Amino acid sequence: INGIFIAGYGIKGVAKAVEVKNRSKEIKIICYDNSAFVTDYVKKGVIDAVICQDPEKQGYMALKILSDLIIGDKEVKADTYMTSIDIRLCENIDRDFQEWEI
């Protein structure tokens, strides 16, 4: 195994196992969604990349659009709404990406 992609729960366990077996140089780990422990593992070099999806904004936008349709009787302006996706690495894990929003 030279790479692991984690799209759900289990990030902490996988990262810990790779770290305990001292294989972080051989096994590249990419996962979704940042958290305090993910940031720590990125800084240690155990996790190589994190795809941050902004789940707060995703949830907010979905409920706002639904609320506008049902309660506000407002027309939906588009059939697709995009939220930002940030790729975080060791070099930029601490950077605030909010300022980069378009």
Model-found features: residue ranges?
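Hydrophobic/aromatic beta-strand patches that form the interior of the parallel beta-sheet core
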Residues: 5, 30, 49-51, 88
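Short, well-ordered coil/turn elements that cap or connect secondary structure elements
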Residues: 24, 44-45, 82
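Flexible loop/hinge segments that line or gate small-molecule binding clefts
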Residues: 35-43, 47
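Electropositive phosphate-/nucleotide-binding environments in soluble metabolic enzymes
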Residues: 8, 53-56, 60
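Hinge/cleft segment of the Venus flytrap/periplasmic-binding protein
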Residues: 57-102
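Hydrophobic alpha-helical
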Residues: 1-37
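Short beta-strand elements at the ligand-binding edges of bilobed clamshell
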Residues: 44-56
